[in-house]
Amino acid sequence: MLWQGESIRKVTGGRRRPAQGKRRFEIGLAPADTHIGEDRSKLVRTTGGNTKIRSMRAQFANVTNLANGETKKVKIENVEENGANPNYVRRNLLTKGAIIRTEIGRARIMSRPGQDGIINAVLLA
């Protein structure tokens, strides 16, 4: 759990006296950290009683070839680059914008696996 409310400290270092305590809607969840492996997802309740599918592990990605508009379900081999964090490459974490190696070549992830529960990618030329 991660509290995302306003800080008690001001920029100057002084202390604010909050009018209220911490509220449930100010609390966020830990990141999903989607790894490469046998498909596993988790259903999470969100604001308004809606649900989100969090992909914990993923083995396949829907890769689209923009040249001919064809989409294929292909196996993910490993993570090659990740602009979000260099450590994610070592840990093989799948995030939006990560470049992955697949059976048909390199692809960039366009979806958010921790939010959407699915991996959509675009084939790189």
Curated annotation (Swiss-Prot):
Q: Where is this region: Disordered?
A: 1-20
Q: Which GO molecular function annotations are given, in alphabetical order?
A: structural constituent of ribosome
Kindly list the GO CC terms recorded for this protein.
ribonucleoprotein complex; ribosome
Q: Which CDD domains match?
A: Ribosomal_S8e
Q: What top-level branch of life does the organism fall under?
A: Archaea
Which one GO biological process term can you cite for this protein?
translation
Q: Please provide an example of a Pfam family that matches this protein in its UniProt record.
A: Ribosomal_S8e
Tell me which UniProt keywords the record has, alphabetically: Ribonucleoprotein, Ribosomal protein
Summarize subunit and interaction data from the UniProt record for this chain.
Part of the 30S ribosomal subunit.
The entry sums up its family as follows: Belongs to the eukaryotic ribosomal protein eS8 family.
This protein is called: Small ribosomal subunit protein eS8
Q: Which gene encodes it?
A: rps8e
